[in-house]
Amino acid sequence: MRTSNYLLSTLKETPNDAEVISHQLMLRAGMIRKLASGLYTWLPTGLRVLRKVENIVRQEIDNAGAVEILMPVVQPFELWEETGRSEKMGPELLRFTDRHSRPFVLSPTAEEVVTSLVRNEISSYKQLPLNLYQIQTKFRDERRPRFGVMRAREFSMMDAYSFDIDKEGLEKSYQAMHDAYCKAFDRMGLEYRPVLADSGAIGGSGSQEFHVLAESGEDLIAFSSDSDYAANIEKAEALAPTAELAAATQEMELVDTPNAKTIAELVEQHGLAIEKTVKTLFVKASDEIDADIVALIIRGDHELNEVKAENLPQVASPLEMAEEAEIRALIGAGPGSLGPVGLELPFIVDRTVAIMSDFGAGANVDGKHYFGINWGRDVELAQVEDLRNVVEGDLSPCGQGTIQLKRGIEVGHIFQLGTNYSKKMNCNVLGPDGKSATLEMGCYGIGVSRIVASAIEQNNDENGIIWPTALAPFQVAIVPMNMAKSEEVKAAAESLYAELTAAGIEVLFDDRKERPGVMFKDIELIGIPHTIVIGNRSLENGEMEYKDRRDGNKVAVPVADVVEMIKQKLA
């Protein structure tokens, strides 16, 4: 490709609204342009990278035995009503009606559509296993689109759906897709980790996320220092406490704390150790219990894990904190003064709180706390659950090593759905025993456009992007110095371009009438792995200059050896 025939729209300055490095560099390198909030046009350089990602994903998913199809982006709303997800998805699901007032949605995912397809096309277990996938545009009406294509409203995604006659078959399909993901991400040159995950709105039982490790990642992942255990922060657990409840050494005392409305203020003003405090959080209750509010009690230095909380049957999903007015109407006190002693509401205690003794908590009276609280003596211990986020240094749940935390960008997710969708949508076939059997489903997603941004987060320097070779928009750049003034340089550049192109190598030939400095900056910015510089002085010595984008090394190469050297670099 010649730059004279190409849209090379690079920017010198970083746009003000670009927060993370991938968004900045994708704009500066002319990969994308913003059309509206969360909506981007992919320019030639970006589209070439996107297609590279798609092709690697397609090859590995094909190798796993999946079959490609293409489903509509527009889906009938009635399918979503069949599974009950029409409301569970919330405002992210974009709804609209056609001219005949028939309701539709813009696809954020396709479980309903593919299940509808399979229930009409498959009738016997003999047609299984079956794994169908597509690479298609999706839309989720994000409340706050940010970070460029990392969290856009419209995005490209590979979504696959497996159908098996039994759980054993589902597990085989699931493992095959897990392995395909690993092969795809390995080929892309990404540093990533598969981690245990919560199934969220998709539903089902087991699931794993695949995270590209990056400091800019929105997600925290936890992993053991000495084992293979890894989970996202929503799913991660620490080893359950094994210590017995310590004996009381203090009498419970009511203390005036008028200026201590937070745990930090309580610790600072009254000298309590923070691990000897608890905080009591009031959340909306589900219909499972005869109460409007349920209290969740965690240690003062811990944070509530909202996913763990809303997975409890007593807690409304999605999780909703009680308003202060509601709390005051029930208790007569506000947040900052709440605690378990005398609390006439259902409450659930975190595992770490259940083994605490002599601790402090709000007295359910504004400006007062109890110190020296002990379970059994001052308040009966209620239901005990794992409610908190893990922290660095926690013991790993496998019993090997301690928990470490890193930031990651989720680029893939795989689920064992079981019969969660197939049962609701009557997706049944004739089983081997001659009876009707509900299909076991798995679903699998890869954020194709998000991978592009994630790769940049891992591969950049002060000059721009440093693409892994497998994802680079071009493999080689040819930069002729002052070609317009030198027939020798022009002839050598044209000859090299023809040879490399004939060898099937993807080349960007910078034939612009630009200063060499401008050309070099653009080539480095867009991240082409290998650059050949051609100038009069080097040609007089029978050489061309080779530059490696990743390490910056330059070396003079005999003209006759350049093509072979490039082939070896790309092998």
From Swiss-Prot:
The protein, known as: Proline--tRNA ligase
Name of the gene encoding the protein in the UniProt record: proS
One example of a Gene Ontology biological process annotation: prolyl-tRNA aminoacylation
Subunit description: Homodimer.
NCBIfam families per the UniProt record, alphabetical: PRK09194.1, proS_fam_II
Highest taxon of source: Bacteria
Described function: Catalyzes the attachment of proline to tRNA(Pro) in a two-step reaction: proline is first activated by ATP to form Pro-AMP and then transferred to the acceptor end of tRNA(Pro). As ProRS can inadvertently accommodate and process non-cognate amino acids such as alanine and cysteine, to avoid such errors it has two additional distinct editing activities against alanine. One activity is designated as 'pretransfer' editing and involves the tRNA(Pro)-independent hydrolysis of activated Ala-AMP.
PANTHER family with a match to the protein in the record: MITOCHONDRIAL RIBOSOME PROTEIN L39/PROLYL-TRNA LIGASE FAMILY MEMBER, PROLINE--TRNA LIGASE
Ranges annotated as spanning the membrane: none
Pfam families: HGTP_anticodon, tRNA-synt_2b, tRNA_edit
